Amino acid sequence: MNLLTVTNLSAGYAGKQVIKDISFFVAPKTIVGILGANGCGKTTLIKAIANLLPHTGSCQLDDTYLENASPRQLALLCGYIPQKSGISIDLSLLDVVLMGFNPKLSLLQSPTEQMKKEAFDTLCSVGLGSRKDDNFQQLSEGQKQLCLLARTFVLKRRLLLLDEPESALDFRLRYETMGLLRTYVAKNNAAALVTLHDPSLALNYCDTLLVLSDCGLLGELQPFSTPISKMEPLLSSIYGTISLTTLSTRSGEKRLIMIKEDDAC
């Protein structure tokens, strides 16, 4: 059974259509990467699914149509991480993660001791447990992103929507973050949709890739099963001529590497 089914989704800004008639489904325990050139609608797609933009079409999460969900119900079902945190006040890391429980709390209700324990445990899972009392504003951009990831994890939502989570991360943290996502979706029978700029990261951590171009879905591929001969033309259509090769790590794992060809040759 599909966890998420998106049907004929169209959305845009200020009267301009950015995505049109996009349909796909997402299975449980999977990560779906969204690739495409700047301006093709990656962020628009994520925001439309999160019900943050007016749109036509439908997004069904299990038995719930997200268009019909209340803000609280939507917040319980979906976790959304934008490109910028939106946090401008001084808060401890623990308090930021505790914000993830807000959909479960009434207006004047405080987090329970159990919630505080779960928030701390989740901070530990992303490597920030020792900094729980530090000021969020004093973190590096990469550390802020990890803290926001913990905030999204803590409620164990079924669907995570992440807009360029790797953009502020260094090489090591990019791969650690995708590893954390993979662990989360497997453990919680959940799924994640992720917009990415790094195709090599997407090729090695995403179960499915949606390739966007000119308002629509250009194609889908499964990096772990689609033949390289079929992936190369699709990826070349958005990145220019590329070639893919497979390398083995020291532990014997296979990795896909994308190489940009010199268009001048």
Which role fits each region the language model picked out?
Residues L35-A37:
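The feature captures the beta-strand-to-loop junction immediately N-terminal to the Walker
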Residues A50:
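Helix-to-loop junction immediately C-terminal to a conserved catalytic motif
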Residues G57-Y65, L74:
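Conserved ABC transporter NBD signature motif
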Residues L98, E113-R131, K156:
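Conserved ABC ATPase "signature" region
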Residues N135-L139:
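Conserved ABC ATPase signature
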Residues L160-E164:
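Catalytic Walker B motif of ABC-type/P-loop ATPase nucleotide-binding domains
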Residues M231-C265:
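ABC ATPase nucleotide-binding domains
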